Amino acid sequence: MRMSATVGIGRIPVRDVQPVVEYGRRPAKAVTGETFEVTATVFREGHDAVAANVVLKDPEGRPGPWTPMRELAPGSDRWGATVTPGAPGNWTYRVEAWSDPVATWRHAARIKVPAGIDAGLVLEEGSELYRRAAAGVPKDSGRDVLLAAATALLDDTLPVATRLAAALTPQVDAVLARHPLRDLVTSSDPLPLLVERERALYGAWYEFFPRSEGTPHTPHGTFRTAARRLPAIAAMGFDVVYLPPIHPIGTTHRKGRNNTLSATGDDVGVPWAIGSPEGGHDSIHPALGTLDDFDHFVTEAARHGLEIALDFALQCSPDHPWVHKHPEWFHHRPDGTIAHAENPPKKYQDIYPIAFDADPDGLATETVRILRHWMDHGVRIFRVDNPHTKPVAFWERVIADINGTDPDVIFLAEAFTRPAMMATLAQIGFQQSYTYFTWRNTKQELTEYLEELSGEAAAYMRPNFFANTPDILHAYLQHGGRPAFEVRAVLAATLSPTWGIYSGYELCENTPLREGSEEYLDSEKYQLKPRDWTRAAREGTTIAPLVTRLNTIRREHPALHRLRNLRFHHTDNDALIAYSKRVGSDVVLVVANLDPHRTQEATISLDMPQLGLDWHDSVPVHDELTGRTYHWGRANYVRLEPGRAPAHVFHVRRPSAAAAPQNGGSGAS
């Protein structure tokens, strides 16, 4: 076997290998155990057969067993194979293509031998090929099978049809599949693959303000009082607790309730206005407690199976120590004052933005120091506030520094901005990204956006679907009431491997600051907001049971841990959306009513092969939300009524896995 160097086009052209990020200059991404497809265009001159395989090379540089590719559609020249990397680290993958002389000979022999065209010569050629192939097969892996076939091909005491048949047996096929005869092997250039821990792709997040978790006697919460909330968060099935900034808050231009410019002495300020004489980004707000209290909070979270994600907002209040120690880090106007932050139409009079170009080295060094400080106290996830308002090169440098020694640390980009910026932030190192999910509410919007996210973008960008945030209360939730909160939770939890809610979502808090605003009235950004969780549970005014069930379903179904496996199915009513995810034998099918006001019905036409089924199959589908089981085939009637059931979340079972299913489609649910 001769390996051709990849110079120019290559002897067997290997073109357009996917996934590829920025022409291979940046790695495609996966997590441990995540299966993804590698594709390439492979062809050659003339009519001789070609074949191809994928080779993964682990972080130690060891190539794994090569994975055979298949032509994705006859005559397309597009080949593909799924691969699954193991341990975290920097992998590579490449596609090898080759001329397949055995397949070429078999095609010709099946035509010529029955027709009596040079039958003896054709069989002799086949015998030579099989002997060549046998030389590359270990003795205990079927070498004798190929040698026996080669001998039979030359046995002129047998009819030519029998001699040919001896070379086409399933046993021969199996040996050649494991050890093909490969001529003119040509390899693509290796492409980089970054494999990260599972949490980079999959998890359920819960955001809350520790300062709102006080007591009747001491309204301002501490880390000690906030830790009492952790068991309930864990019981709802969340994996990550995300905290807004926990640092000292400035008093200069402090915002009052509902973003008023005149704060009273009782106003607690905005956590994102970081810094005071008590300290900056490496300090804890005195009202929250001490660093020991924070360590206790992190320990308690871990005891309940929760990771801590800490907000990292690279900005300052006018009272931050940096303002005096590092004046070069800020934009100074001609009169000597520092311009406050703006994100039109929003203004942040209590915040100074950072100027990055005067001392980029100093800023990067200080940023890394701060991040490592919190890492030393158990934080392995950072939610980065507005990274799109800082230089991309700065984040690339900082993340590379952190992940170079601590590859398990995860950075979430809170960037609601232009697509090019969001994509680039993901490509230069951010493990996760906020998305436009909040503003995608119709069937067409959701389908188009999710097909984008689960397509080529999935090679570098991992979405985090927050159903709400302290900044964003979408009109859909404002006007849709509890049914809107329910269906958006279902969508977020089943469309994206990572989803989250901000505290109060489970209580369906939906009063806006004013009509047309996406801000909350009495926003928790500006004031304490204690909630009576016990009363809500007692009176049934919480959707926490639904949230808990959704997170349980997610944990029980590996298909929901992935993004690239998302497929949509046809509905004849655009108020209903249907989609599925499949990993191995685990198949989840979701049908959701996007209209929170009215009962909707539709016929759902399933793409059965996407479910791993034949077109004529009829299988039990078990609704994981209601416990009911139905028999579904290719076309199925669905009726969903807001207030009774926001959706069906079906586990598609094999017929032997369910007992006594109800015939037909679903009734009102």
Swiss-Prot record:
Pfam families hit by this protein: GLGE_C, GlgE_dom_N_S
Catalytic residues of the enzyme: D385 (nucleophile), E414 (proton donor)
Residues at the site labelled Transition state stabilizer: D471
Keywords recorded for this protein, A-Z: Carbohydrate metabolism, Glycosyltransferase, Transferase
Originating species: Streptomyces coelicolor (strain ATCC BAA-471 / A3(2) / M145)
InterPro entries: GlgE, GLGE_C, GlgE_dom_N/S, Glyco_hydro_13_cat_dom, Glyco_hydro_b, Glycoside_hydrolase_SF, Ig-like_fold
GO MF annotation terms: alpha-amylase activity; hexosyltransferase activity
One biological process term in Gene Ontology: alpha-glucan biosynthetic process
Function: Maltosyltransferase that uses maltose 1-phosphate (M1P) as the sugar donor to elongate linear or branched alpha-(1->4)-glucans. Maltooligosaccharides with a degree of polymerization (DP) superior or equal to 4 are efficient acceptors, with DP6 being optimal in the GlgE-catalyzed polymerization with M1P. Is probably involved in a branched alpha-glucan biosynthetic pathway from trehalose, together with TreS, Mak and GlgB.
Protein's UniProt name: Alpha-1,4-glucan:maltose-1-phosphate maltosyltransferase 2
Keyword Membrane in annotation: no
Subunit structure: Homodimer.
Signal sequence segment: none
Record gene name: glgE2
SMART domains linked to this entry: Aamy
Catalytic activity line of the entry: alpha-maltose 1-phosphate + [(1->4)-alpha-D-glucosyl](n) = [(1->4)-alpha-D-glucosyl](n+2) + phosphate
Class of enzymatic activity (EC top level): transferase
Keyword Transferase: yes
Enzyme Commission numbers on file: 2.4.99.16
Annotated positions binding alpha-maltose 1-phosphate: K255, Q315, D350, N386, K525, Y526
Entry similarity comment: Belongs to the glycosyl hydrolase 13 family. GlgE subfamily.
